[in-house]
């Protein structure tokens, strides 16, 4: 059985792979959920510094909330497979349209069950930071993400429309 590692806080050791992850998503054209500002930050070292700042409540930019960035890595070849971000609490936008957790699996590694495993591995951390339940949203029609959430105990709450992206989002809660 394949061993996976969930690594808290990206490090310089993964800078090249973070750049490759970003490039793969930009070429694919998909959403980079759970990566914070990776789409707009080209330099992986700058991205790593940004992630470190966001975990520290004293250093997080004023319009954001503290968040912890995780990398999902396959142990046998040390390949970066996915990213997941845990937001420690809500602001208005997160409560309505993003939730506590965002995640993505690189396009070339999808449909292998990695998202389900990555989410499961992240839930104990959510308990550690004091959350009793987590809100996760997915675009209506994203059956892969919906299956991932349901497999981890997600309970459907409602569907909301996000006007900025003009999409409907399904809201799920997972009790910890």
Predicted regions and their residues:
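Catalytic cores of nucleotide-sugar-dependent glycosyltransferases that transfer UDP/GDP/TDP-activated
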Residues: 72, 131, 159-162
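Short coil/turn motifs at secondary-structure junctions
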Residues: 89-91, 108, 141
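Residue-level recognition of the GNAT/N-acetyltransferase active site
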Residues: 102, 106, 139, 162
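Conserved acetyl-CoA-binding loop-helix of GNAT-fold acetyltransferases
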Residues: 102-105, 111-124, 128, 147-151
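Conserved beta-strand-loop-alpha-helix junction that forms the acyl-donor binding cleft
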Residues: 136-146
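Conserved catalytic-core motifs of GNAT/GCN5-like acyltransferases
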Residues: 137-138, 153-171
């Amino acid at each position: 059985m394949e061993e996976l590692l969930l690594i808290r806080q990206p490090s310089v050791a993964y800078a090249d792979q973070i750049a490759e992850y970003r490039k793969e998503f930009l070429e694919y054209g998909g959403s980079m959920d759970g990566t914070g500002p990776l789409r707009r930050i080209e330099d992986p070292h700058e991205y790593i510094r940004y992630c470190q700042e966001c975990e520290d409540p004293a250093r997080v930019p004023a319009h954001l909330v503290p968040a912890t960035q995780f990398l999902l890595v396959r142990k046998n070849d040390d390949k970066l497979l996915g990213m997941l971000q845990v937001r420690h609490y809500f602001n208005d936008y997160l409560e309505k349209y993003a939730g506590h957790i965002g995640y993505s699996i690189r396009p070339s590694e999808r449909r292998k069950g990695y998202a389900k495993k990555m989410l499961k591995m992240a839930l104990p951390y959510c308990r550690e930071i004091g959350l009793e339940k987590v809100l996760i949203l997915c675009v209506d029609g994203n059956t892969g993400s919906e299956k991932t959430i349901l497999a981890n105990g997600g309970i459907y709450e409602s569907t909301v429309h996000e006007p900025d992206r003009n999409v409907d989002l399904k809201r799920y809660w997972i009790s910890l």
